[in-house]
């Protein structure tokens, strides 16, 4: 059994277009602002209530950044898996600042586009290499009926 686990899974909508930045080494990084909303009915008033939580998502994986650049925009519904990381820095006044982010990099990160252009679910998983998947079959299954002997 593993000693610990750091895994975050979210389904939500982007609150703004992705921000793509380039590091000094020329590597692209995508920053996303993902909203998740809890909806419930108030027991006393019967009124519908909701609470939206905003999550910072940072993508370092080259393949995932490419998908974000080409297919993701404000309002996109995404499924993401990553790890939770907190970074610390000093602002211009020397005050320590902290931020907690969901980070997608290297292995065990996943990004699924839940509302692609063709109304089919598309996904990109990073398991050592980038691979873009479509849920449509790669061949037509209707041709198989002609070969069944009964």
Swiss-Prot record:
Keyword list, A-Z: DNA damage, DNA recombination, DNA repair, DNA replication, DNA-binding
DNA-binding region: 54-60
Motif Important for interaction with partner proteins per UniProt: ranges: 145-150
Location of region: Disordered: 119-150
Disulfide bond entries: none
Domain SSB: from-to ranges: 5-111
Biased composition (Basic and acidic residues): 128-142
Molecular function GO terms recorded: single-stranded DNA binding
Single biological process term from Gene Ontology: DNA recombination
Keyword presence, 4Fe-4S: no
Any one GO CC term of the record: nucleoid
Entry-linked CDD domains: SSB_OBF
UniProt-listed InterPro entries: NA-bd_OB-fold (IPR012340), Primosome_PriB/ssb (IPR000424), ssDNA-bd (IPR011344)
Subunit relationships: Homotetramer.
Function: Plays an important role in DNA replication, recombination and repair. Binds to ssDNA and to an array of partner proteins to recruit them to their sites of action during DNA metabolism.
NCBIfam families according to UniProt: PRK06642.1, ssb
Protein name, per record: Single-stranded DNA-binding protein
Source organism phylogeny: Bacteria, Pseudomonadati, Pseudomonadota, Alphaproteobacteria, Rickettsiales
